[in-house]
Amino acid sequence: MLSGNFMKMRPTSDGAGQALSDITTGLLPSLTYLADILPKESIVWKMKMLRTASSFVNSRLHAVKAQTLVLASGNDELLPSREEAERLDGMLQNCRIRHFRDNGHKILLEDEFDLATTIKGAGYYRRSRQTDFVSDYLPVTPDELEKAINRDRVLSFATDPVMLSTLPDGKIVRGLAGLPREGPVVLVGYHMLMGFELGPLVTGVLKSTGIHIRGLAHPFLFSKSSEQILPDPSAHDLHRIMGAVPVTPVNFYKLLSEKHFVLLYPGGAREALHRKGEEYKLFWPEQSEFVRMASRFGATIIPFGAVGEDDICDVLLDYNDLLKLPFYDILDKRLNEDAPKLRTDSTGEVKNQDMHPVVVTPKVPGRFYFVFGKPIETRGREKELRDKEKAQHLYLHVKSEVESCIEYLKEKREEDPYRSILHRLLYQAAHGSDTEIPTFEP
């Protein structure tokens, strides 16, 4: 019954280890008396009792309504944890599964496993009866941040992101000196293909400045239906751990009221899952959405641009191509039939917020570039921006600034001698792997 991965268990002190060894050694002679204490008839009776109890529990699992989180060890040598987890998921009304491929039977005793992080990632931590994605959130820990950075380490190494910001006087500098240090702030920008920019952006800003960006994300990332479709149910846990919340007016209001830095992509899924030839094209609603809410709290609006997706891959099959494939309509229905609907009252391409995969072909990696534009203050302009026309004018100005940021980066990256990973590898070979690699002059 002690089957487990002892290599991953938390080490004990020498004294405790010796005491455990002495106790175990002392118990060995007592094992010979087990046959007298537990005769065959007793064992048979206990097995029958266990089967009866198991049948009783299984017959009532469907009535359990409480939130249930099932942890399934992939390396469990004692019980078929993965199979049992799938069975429970089909019987319990409010169940979510988290698979741990490399963990053993005693997963809770293993050093690398963090139960609190797992609960946070599943969205099961709450402070009250009702789930509140804003107030329920627990700040990311140093270990969680390190794991998030490690998860994107390959992408960050391959793209070596360059971050620029704009000072209040309009001067563009390398680094994040142009970002305000206090909220509320709304970061509004372009959503790269498949959200490639999210990891380097959120973790890079947090590690460099201590500013924790809270993203407004598609509700699909928080739904159980998405977990049942994806190969890994925990694929989106990191977004929750890093502070993402479903994009709703209420959540936006709460984040601004608590003076957070809020990351907003008006183009949403249509922008992140764009078609061939649509890179760096904005798909924003025609009418302003965030301006009046931002002005209500005196939030600073910072437009930003991000480029580099076309330097790491090309779109091979987009949504239009997938719809022509045999049987894809089955997957399309599973992805979107029960998914939360966004932009239903919008016009134009932005209303097409269907979720779907994108098939890409990789390229020799180039480089990611970010530039945060000049901060736009709304403090003291609440009455002015209540006027729809003035709010719309500011909205279009923000959109224009985002487009200008993108064009600026597309032009300036041509001047970067280290845009290619090959040139960066040669530079690091000569100057050391920890050396910051130069880029163009802002």
Predicted regions located by residue number:
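Non-catalytic C-terminal accessory region of glycerolipid acyltransferases
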Residues: 117, 123-154, 254-442
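Catalytic core of membrane glycerolipid acyltransferases/transacylases, capturing the structured
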Residues: 183-252, 257-258, 269-286
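Helix-to-loop junction immediately C-terminal to a conserved catalytic motif
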Residues: 160-191
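Catalytic active-site module of serine/aspartate enzymes centered on a nucleophile-bearing elbow/loop
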Residues: 86, 92-138
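Conserved alpha/beta-hydrolase catalytic His-Asp/Glu region
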Residues: 2-61
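Conserved alpha/beta-hydrolase "acid-adjacent" motif
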Residues: 77-84
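Short beta-strand/loop motif that positions the catalytic acidic residue
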Residues: 63-65, 70-76
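Acidic beta-to-alpha connecting loop that harbors the catalytic carboxylate
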Residues: 74-77, 102-104
